[in-house]
Amino acid sequence: MDTAQKQRWAITLSYDGSRFYGWQKQADGVPTVQAALETALAQIAGEAVSTTVAGRTDTGVHATAQVVHFDTAAVRPVQAWVRGVNAHLPEGIAVLHARQVAPEFHARFDAYGRHYRYLLESAPVRSPLLKNRAGWTHLKLDIGQMRQAAALLIGEQDFSSFRAAECQAKSPVKTIYRADLTQSSGLVRLDLHGNAFLHHMVRNIMGALVYVGSGRLSVEGFAALIQERSRLKAPPTFMPDGLYLTGVDYPEAYGIIRPQIPEWL
């Protein structure tokens, strides 16, 4: 970037993934978060804008605190990149914060931690009010067993058993710092905090934990699955509906705000 001509901005945004075909802009013009955001940014900047995201999300996956950076020669106040951009965005996307950052800041490569929540409804009948907002199973779940299995995820490990075949990550070794599983009012919440995640990793973990909770897989079997390092013997990938990117960690010097998880989630 020519720092004499352009400024680098970081924005935090939230979106409803059920309205879009994932994050990444596609050649066929289907609605994606990136395409909608870049169109809105261009309206404010008066020039084409290219964005770089902290982590791409798939179709149906939501975000409460995604982080993006972009460069522009346009000189605009902060509110132009928040309220102004929001005025040009379709329903389902909102910019929460904007901040001018150092020219070397990189939304993806400077991130040292990512937070995900999976919201799961466990009920005989799926609530129509939670469709696209939460995953669902009609099975009764043993939360204690699921919690024991989730604890086995913590640490630096090879997570090949939870890696999608099309994953482009250079290494399957990732570090999970926190894996909490709670239940209230029929909703199960899985919170994962790690340095990085493989493609479909959280959804594959959730699928395996549902197997544990329903008795189809023991805690010992879950541990063996991790050690197997093979996707071939793992339970199927769980639905995207309940998956939320809830935060990205950056060095404090960049001043990137990480919003609290909304109370409704």
Curated annotation (Swiss-Prot):
GO-annotated biological processes: tRNA pseudouridine synthesis
Chain's role: Formation of pseudouridine at positions 38, 39 and 40 in the anticodon stem and loop of transfer RNAs.
Positions bound to substrate: Y116
Active-site residue numbers: D58 (nucleophile)
Catalytic activity: uridine(38/39/40) in tRNA = pseudouridine(38/39/40) in tRNA
Assembly notes: Homodimer.
UniProt-recorded name of the protein: tRNA pseudouridine synthase A
The enzyme's E.C. designation: 5.4.99.12
Gene Ontology terms for molecular function: RNA binding; tRNA pseudouridine(38-40) synthase activity
Cross-referenced Gene3D superfamilies: Pseudouridine synthase I, catalytic domain, C-terminal subdomain, Pseudouridine synthase I, catalytic domain, N-terminal subdomain
One Pfam assignment: PseudoU_synth_1
